[in-house]
């Protein structure tokens, strides 16, 4: 099971300030606790600013075939946006980021693990569910799982550092 928690409002608004935003919500896995009410409230606030080009709510965005079909329907609105803001677990953000390579894709949620079922993605994605949400800084690549030492603060220091 996973728990997704919204990032701090200040962190999200700093990402979206002055940008046109397309929002993607994932309501897929029943095993994922998703803060629907809080996300809806925040999205209404963002939309009130007039910078939201569209909102897509779907399920299982971690399934690439499903995601591709859904995104194609909204591609004109996505192209208008400077930023795609994804309200899902880290794997969902990675799936969207992989498909929309020419767009800035940011996570609006942090992901935390709870023992048990971990979602339905048929592929190997790398998210350690650390709750830090580094995906916004790294183009959808989790540095915790991509680095054998889980370093996030620079190059590998080798055996001495």
Model features per residue range: what roles?
Residues 1-158:
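Iron-sulfur-associated redox domains of electron-transfer enzymes in respiratory
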